[in-house]
Amino acid sequence: GSIQVKWLRRILVTDLPAMAKDETSEYTDVTADGRVLAFTWVMEPQSIITYPSGGQRVQPGFHEIRGLAWSGFGRIAKVEVSFDEGRTWRKAVLEPPVEPYAFVRFKLQWYWDGKEVVLWSRAWDEKGNTQPTREEFFRRWSRNNRYHYNAIQAWRILPDGRVVNGDRPLGQGAFGPVGPVGGCGGEVLDV
């Protein structure tokens, strides 16, 4: 299996999906209405700003926003960055090579005036698929769908320059309130 390769003792090649515990639970997605999609292998478009990002500190002035984008559907076509929680977008520069199914670096020049701001990035692939907001993601998928979670990760820069998770809590769901959980926010768990 792909989950515990360190315990590999033998390899069995088959032309059918493995029906092992980890493959059936981790590669199964639950939709918002409770339907189950088994064996969803492809990761939809995703991007993440790596600078500035959580735990870092920045000073007012000019900065180069940097990050990574990828898609399981092929080549990244563009990445956009928002400084106002998605009301407006600026196109980032993709650094070559831009290959199908591969990480692509992006960058965008930006001046920070020292006021609180929330940064978002979103990726688009060559098939027209785009990265959803958290709200869009959870209208489609269950709140515990963390293995294929690809919603926009927000970074909030506070006036003192600290960069923290900028995701807003989502409110009540089937398992109570869901908010940002440690790390980069990529793990979405009911807390």
What are these regions (language model features)?
Residues 1-191:
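Extended, aromatic/histidine-rich regions of cofactor-dependent oxidoreductases associated
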